[in-house]
From Swiss-Prot:
InterPro entries: aa-tRNA-synth_I_CS (IPR001412), Arg-tRNA-ligase (IPR001278), Arg-tRNA-synth_N (IPR005148), Arg-tRNA-synth_N_sf (IPR036695), ArgRS_core (IPR035684), DALR_anticod-bd (IPR008909), Rossmann-like_a/b/a_fold (IPR014729), tRNAsynth_Ia_anticodon-bd (IPR009080). SMART domains: Arg_tRNA_synt_N (SM01016), DALR_1 (SM00836). It comes from Rickettsia bellii (strain OSU 85-389). The lineage of its organism: Bacteria, Pseudomonadati, Pseudomonadota, Alphaproteobacteria, Rickettsiales. Keywords: Aminoacyl-tRNA synthetase, ATP-binding, Cytoplasm, Ligase, Nucleotide-binding, Protein biosynthesis. This is Arginine--tRNA ligase. It is found in: Cytoplasm.
Amino acid sequence: MNIFNKLKHDIITASTQLYNNSEIANHASIETPKDSFNGDLSSNIAMIIAAKKNVPPREVALKFKEILNELPYIASIEIAGPGFINFTIKADSWHTAIKDILQNESKFFEIDVDKNKNINIEYVSANPTGPMHIGHARGAVYGDVLANILKKVGYPVTKEYYVNDAGSQINDLVSTVILRYREALGEKITITEGLYPGEYLIPVGQALAKEYGDKLLNMDELERFKIVKNFAIQKMLDLNKEDLKELGVKHDVFFSEQTLHDNGKIEKTVKLLTDMGLIYEGSVPAPKGKVHAEWENRTQELFKSTKYGDDQDRPIRKADGSWTYFASDLAYAKDKIDRGANHLIYVLGADHSGYVKRIEATVKALGKEQVKVDVKICQLVNFVENGVPVKMSKRLGTFASVQDVNHEVGKDIIRFMMLTRENNKTLDFDLIKVKEQSKENPIFYVQYAHVRTLSILSKAMETIPQSYNSFEAGTYDLSLLSSEEEIEIIKLLASWTKTLETAAKYFEPHRVAFYLINLASKFHALWNFGKENNDYRFIIENNVELTTARLALAKAIQKIIASGLEVIGVEPMTRM
């Protein structure tokens, strides 16, 4: 058990002893204070109990201090501010983290999670109308890494892609592909406004011509539409899947929107909501600002989404009687719940930020307040090439595709760099910086740290085999790792599982990248310190025992960096 969980467990035990209640203590946090002056770890347990019991928090804190002071791994306890309990941990307890990382990983990575939670995370879900652009890559990486983190800490997770194959954009795609088909047969064509002018559809038209010849020209229009639609969607979906594969992004399920229509699931969901009294006849207010040409004031079927926190009730049928896109969303959420998911996570692009409340309302209604929902928005990526922004429009035919950028810098750089900013903040992707070999390039800095640790171990095997053999045998005296710099790194290593736990709790995969950058920085600083002072070198040929201990430290750093890169989906480099 890592030090964070150990302290949490002991706080729960103390809470039971003092107040005959362990449940309250489950809500207490164990954090690392921003200022090391406040100790190694801190807890808010006293304030949580004080609020429940209506007693002064410092009085509660003092009671906990009296009990927890007896723990063998606690060096000292101080009460700060309104009632924070700050703990200083004995050095040998930090050293235990190194042993666990090297000899007992399952113990080190032990994290308590809700075993009854079944998570469905939907991400990417790009319309199958063209190659994926670099903006899609941000949501793809965010969702994929978040899913990896959730799995790593122990949750069952389904990674899902929603194929939007039933909307008006598909009609435009079909119209464009038919034109490209005619072009492949020798006709001169004009791509009219509103269609997709990109050259990526030329080979789709050619493939259609190769398979069908000119048979489609004189075919019934409806039959031709169906054939071309299925053909084009499959080609575009294959293209998107290939883009995702090159990015290292994996999904467990590709779910077709069209199946919701074909299988009557929209009708069934609407009937369920009608029986719940959540569907009614009414009208929606005009859009704010300039009235859209397609808006009309009419009576229509609406879902009572305002009952669940939405800004307005949502139409489920269009004027022509067909289902709205939102009606499909309702049925899709119901399908996820029917498949056993009790926590739905949606990862959307910045252009879908207006969908948050309606999605939340949908899940709350269909899950009857028993299914949790979180909607995460990934902001835009400012992609620059030679100082010129690249347009990102499938319709204009000029955009920075995932494939373009992947071929330019590689998937590992893309995946790591997409996590160097929080998902709700705009990200600048600098093609020049990401290829530099300097500490200004975060992925290089982290990979270089990994390579350096391996280099230390390799060099020790050659120059001081006695130390290396002792290290390999697990015979090392970690108490020799006593410098302030070494202890700081060990504390950071010990917090790796806490970082994963926090990243999972708040759906913030960037915490993993930030952690790795911090660890790499501290390791490089320690390594450079050894260049200035021989006593701090990892390998000291006339000090076998200290070298052995530092080899254990180097190996622990290597394993944690490799673990972090694995979570991100980046291959750890072994040489540069």
